[in-house]
A protein has these predicted regions:
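Helix C-cap/helix->beta junction micro-motif
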Residues: 70, 134-135, 163
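Hydrophobic residues in well-ordered beta-strands that form the structural core
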Residues: 55, 76, 139-141, 169
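Conserved core segment of the aminotransferase class I/II
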Residues: 161-233
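Conserved PLP-anchoring active-site segment centered on the Schiff-base-forming lysine
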Residues: 45-67
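Phosphate-binding glycine-rich loop
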Residues: 3-52
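Active-site phosphate-binding strand-loop segment of PLP-dependent enzymes
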Residues: 81-154
Length: 233
């Protein structure tokens, strides 16, 4: 749906080597021109005009800007600090349960967060996955800075490959290679099989309409993947 078969298979092999969950299906990967484009696709996929997404504060102003272009609101949840940064799960529960919470279609996690550098901790992850499942919302995990470990808590792990709830994990070369001009991003879709199948049917339509990845760029992906580990040491 997004690039050459060989390009997707190489990405799957790379993701298998860099996540705790083996067996990435090449068909679960969507290659795009950037992770910014990935946000746009996912908001189109998950939201109608007037819906909302949850996004962290501090976080990217870009998320609100892209959501606004899709006529979607951003509801902020505040990260808290008690010596280290953490997600206030009670606040997430309140935002999803209060009047207007039914408009929320996705929760954005930035793992690790920019600008705080804080990772999603294992206990937070478990509760957030349960919360998203209970409220029928998707999880968008932005992991472009994952390999830059400023807060090495035990149990730091990618959300890519999460099976407990419909999850869209974002990554890309511009951060992985420390090269802002290397504008290639991707989405990895995971979660319960039925939810993934339905999401991919719809995401395929978006991918086929935009056709963001040319073979000229895809042919360079193997070399970029090989260069990635050295760039983040």
């Amino acid at each position: 749906p997004a690039a050459s078969e060989g390009g997707n298979e190489r990405h799957a092999a790379f993701n298998n080597a860099n996540t705790a969950i083996e067996g990435v299906d090449p068909d679960a990967l969507y290659l795009l021109s950037s992770t910014s484009e990935a946000y746009s696709w996912l908001i189109k996929l998950l939201c109608d005009a007037g819906d909302a997404v949850l996004a962290p504060k501090p976080g990217y102003p870009l998320i609100e800007s892209i959501a606004r272009l899709e006529c979607v609101d951003t509801v902020e949840y505040q990260l808290q600090f008690d010596g280290s940064w953490f997600i206030d799960i009670a606040e997430l529960e309140r935002l999803l349960s209060e009047p207007g919470g039914e408009r929320i279609r996705a929760l954005v996690l930035i793992n690790p967060n920019n600008p705080t550098g804080s990772y999603v901790k294992p206990t937070e992850r478990a509760r957030i996955v349960t919360l998203c499942r209970e409220h029928g919302i998707a999880l968008i995990a932005d992991e472009v800075f994952f390999d830059y470990s400023l807060e090495p808590f035990p149990g730091n792990a990618r959300l890519a490959g999460e099976r407990g709830v419909l999850t869209f994990a974002l990554d890309g070369f511009s951060k992985m290679l420390a090269a802002p001009h290397a504008k290639v991003g991707w989405i990895q879709v995971s979660g319960p099989a039925e939810d993934v199948a339905e999401a991919q049917r719809r995401l395929d339509v978006i991918a086929d309409d935009y056709l963001p990845m040319s073979d000229i760029i895809a042919e360079r992906i193997p070399a970029l993947l090989n260069a990635a580990p050295a760039q983040t040491r």
